[in-house]
């Protein structure tokens, strides 16, 4: 890792900015939390498929198992969040609490991706093994599963609230901007 391209530093700064902004409470449309994890899944599968073209079903099974485990952890993490809802002219909005877990996930993902790419680019002998591919897929599954689980939890609670069967009854609606 003698020389990293300039876009890597720009990407790092962008990820830090996104992660820091998620540390503060924010008001979003209910579909917004699910967009980032879906993009994360697509980009990750594409990247891993190109990095490990010889990866077999065992690597994808490890990714799926890790994704399910990460999503479960993310679901339980978001379950304790106290959400607030508001309906305005732009539709339903949900106020999400500030949470540093996305910042940590983004930074861990950046480190893992940099490590994987560097190991392959420098032709490390262990990077060509099937075990490295399986571990790479599993790490990706965990890191993408956690935000996916949190997002699915938030979207599910928004749907329940919209249908009138919300468990958020004790949470006051937040004020309009």
Indicate where each model-derived feature is located.
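Select subsegments of transmembrane alpha-helices in polytopic membrane proteins
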Residues: 6, 33-38, 75-78, 98-112
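C-terminal membrane-adjacent module
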Residues: 102-177
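C-terminal ends of transmembrane helices
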Residues: 15-29, 75-87, 151-157
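A cytosolic-side transmembrane-helix exit/cap motif
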Residues: 52-58, 78-91
